[in-house]
């Protein structure tokens, strides 16, 4: 049996992080099918983000190398954590870093990899946010004042799993990136 502290890759965990780590340990001990997959998994931090309607979303940040391990059990893990934390939607995101754009005055030792650019990180956040659903299309709508709203079209086969979470996805993406976004699930009327 592992301690809840071992599930957190942070020096000073918050109360919420300890509660979620305790829920991880309880799930690991209670369900034998999740035990093998959950044992090596750890998370870095958790942010609680307000969503419209008095709900909250828990954005759980995990290290990028262990994201694939979380994806294996994400649907079961999300369902169980949402049972434990009522009125909160659970979202798993990889902890990614954006390197600043090189300027003329700053001397770069190495070339900035594509995966560390702002665009690449924001696209990956979007993919992590809606996992296991696939993004089938993107549109950018330009408003009169110069603002942009990104419209993301999601796969309609997963409508029951994510339909109630679309507002949470919008709030989390807006809070993390500062970009306006609208999620839509196109209907299959051809």
Curated annotation (Swiss-Prot):
Matches recorded under InterPro entries: Ribosomal_eS7, Ribosomal_eS7_CS
Give the N-acetylserine positions (modified residues).
2
Q: Where in the cell is it found?
A: Cytoplasm; Nucleus, Nucleolus
Which GO biological process entries does UniProt record here?
A: cytoplasmic translation; ribosomal small subunit biogenesis; ribosome biogenesis; rRNA processing
Entry GO terms, CC: 90S preribosome; cytosol; cytosolic small ribosomal subunit; nucleolus; nucleoplasm; small-subunit processome
Please give the superkingdom of this protein's source: Eukaryota
Residues in cross-link Glycyl lysine isopeptide (Lys-Gly) (interchain with G-Cter in ubiquitin): 83-84, 124
Q: Which GO terms describe its molecular function?
A: structural constituent of ribosome
The entry's keywords: Acetylation, Cytoplasm, Isopeptide bond, Nucleus, Ribonucleoprotein, Ribosomal protein, Ribosome biogenesis, rRNA processing, Ubl conjugation
- Report what the Swiss-Prot or TrEMBL entry states about this protein's PTMs: N-terminally acetylated by acetyltransferase NatA.
As a miscellaneous remark, the entry gives: Present with 41000 molecules/cell in log phase SD medium. There are 2 genes for eS7 in yeast.
PANTHER family to which the protein is assigned, alphabetical: 40S RIBOSOMAL PROTEIN S7 (PTHR11278), SMALL RIBOSOMAL SUBUNIT PROTEIN ES7 (PTHR11278:SF0)
As for what it does, the entry says: Component of the ribosome, a large ribonucleoprotein complex responsible for the synthesis of proteins in the cell. The small ribosomal subunit (SSU) binds messenger RNAs (mRNAs) and translates the encoded message by selecting cognate aminoacyl-transfer RNA (tRNA) molecules. The large subunit (LSU) contains the ribosomal catalytic site termed the peptidyl transferase center (PTC), which catalyzes the formation of peptide bonds, thereby polymerizing the amino acids delivered by tRNAs into a polypeptide chain.
Q: Which family does it belong to?
A: Belongs to the eukaryotic ribosomal protein eS7 family.
Quaternary data:
Component of the small ribosomal subunit (SSU). Mature yeast ribosomes consist of a small (40S) and a large (60S) subunit. The 40S small subunit contains 1 molecule of ribosomal RNA (18S rRNA) and 33 different proteins (encoded by 57 genes). The large 60S subunit contains 3 rRNA molecules (25S, 5.8S and 5S rRNA) and 46 different proteins (encoded by 81 genes). Interacts with snoRNA U3. uS11 interacts with MPP10. Component of the ribosomal small subunit (SSU) processome composed of at least 40 protein subunits and snoRNA U3.
What is the name of the protein in this document?
A: Small ribosomal subunit protein eS7A
């Amino acid at each position: 049996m592992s301690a809840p502290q071992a599930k957190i890759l942070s020096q000073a965990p918050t109360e919420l992080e300890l509660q979620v780590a305790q829920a991880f340990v309880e799930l690991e001990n209670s369900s034998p099918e999740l035990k093998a997959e959950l044992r090596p998994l750890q998370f870095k931090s958790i942010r609680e983000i307000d969503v419209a309607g008095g709900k909250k979303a828990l954005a759980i940040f995990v290290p990028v190398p262990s994201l694939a391990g979380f994806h294996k059990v994400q649907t079961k893990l999300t369902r169980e954590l949402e049972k434990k934390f009522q009125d909160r939607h659970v979202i798993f995101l990889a902890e990614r870093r954006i390197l600043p754009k090189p300027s003329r005055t700053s001397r770069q030792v190495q070339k900035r990899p594509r995966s560390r650019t702002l665009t690449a990180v924001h696209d990956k956040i979007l993919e992590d946010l809606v996992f296991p659903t696939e993004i089938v299309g993107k549109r950018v709508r330009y408003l009169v004042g110069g603002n942009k709203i990104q419209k993301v079209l999601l796969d309609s086969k997963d409508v029951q799993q994510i339909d109630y979470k679309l507002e949470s996805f919008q709030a989390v993406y807006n809070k993390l990136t500062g970009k306006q976004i609208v999620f839509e699930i196109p209907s299959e009327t051809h």
